[in-house]
Amino acid sequence: MKTFHLRKEDVKRDWYIIDAKGKNLGRLASLIANVLRGKHKPTFQPDVDCGDYVVVINADKFTVTGKKLTDKEYKFHTNAPGGLKVRNLQWMIEHKPTEALALAVERMLPKNKLQKRYMKRLKLYAGETHPHTAQNLKPLEEVSKLWKAI
């Protein structure tokens, strides 16, 4: 019996939708990262891009526990002298509503060549509307056993 190795041509990609309203940021990002990688599929292989598309609506209405709104910091540098910028989670939600969830998902993905491909399949929208109705979106709840933990 030969060992099965998944090829790009054999991958069938589905589209899933999830409403982030009231969901915990970390648990939601972890679930989305697993679906983007394809870990929910029985044919998962870490070196092959076999993940699915994920559409997230209400991406700015997630919840966090504790004092993370004021204490969690996002640091970036402008590459100018003295250009270190520090923003907290509350500022990110007010000024860049979907960026906080995108960063959480991106940081939960493996840091390799496939990370950019995974992130291109993540579609984040701050409101209820999205332009992906033609893709026959399935609710993400029916895929994951981890859904009860969110």
Swiss-Prot record:
The keyword Oxidoreductase does not apply. Pfam families: Ribosomal_L13. GO terms for cellular component: cytosolic large ribosomal subunit. InterPro entries: Ribosomal_uL13 (IPR005822), Ribosomal_uL13_bac-type (IPR005823), Ribosomal_uL13_sf (IPR036899). One of its GO terms (molecular function) is mRNA binding. One of its GO terms (biological process) is negative regulation of translation. Keywords: Ribonucleoprotein, Ribosomal protein. Belongs to the universal ribosomal protein uL13 family. Part of the 50S ribosomal subunit. This protein is one of the early assembly proteins of the 50S ribosomal subunit, although it is not seen to bind rRNA by itself. It is important during the early stages of 50S assembly. This is Large ribosomal subunit protein uL13.
